[in-house]
Amino acid sequence: AYAAGSGLLDVMLMFLLVPALERLFNLTTDFRLAELTSTNNPLIKRLFNEAPGTFNHSLTVANYVEACAMAIGEDTFLARAAAYFHDIGKLKNPNYYVENQTDGHNPHDEIAPELSVSLLKKHIMYGVMLAREYGLPKELESAITEHHGSFPMKFFYYKARKITEGELDLKNYSYDGPTPTSKINGMLMIVDASE
């Protein structure tokens, strides 16, 4: 009876102490990642309700990135969580992103390509702000900042070339980086660009 009671007490203490220790020492455990990727997570719920196209895109990316992570022996929990949250910045002005344009109206048709690039790049900054507001781990924050690397937005570059005389610098139509610093973020960048 003593052994059973002691074991039960140990399990209860573990469930109470692990979250506190995770936050105290800034650790990201599989328990924390599982909690974050739950459909009960408030940020996941917001994505589902406010930007459903982005939510579906994130789920698809998560499935591919998780499979890639498993294939090369990387942390599948972290890979899935990174994919779930990489585009949370799209919660600000979700209609600027094609996956959320359900009524056929694209606001980018009415504005200059340079403004479109500026607006689209801001989802990175907004994503970092939300990650900090919701207390997401640093690993997920880096996935947000790195998932586009310095890829160009060629659609807007070519659109600008059609209406602009002279040379244009492709860097002005590209994401600001940084490039991925982990295998998971690199896989996320590739899968996100191809999905």
Question: What are these regions, as identified by a protein language model?
Answer:
Residues 1-45:
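Non-catalytic interface/linker regions that flank or bridge core catalytic/transmembrane domains
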Residues 44-195:
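Divalent metal-dependent catalytic cores for phosphoryl transfer on phosphate-bearing substrates
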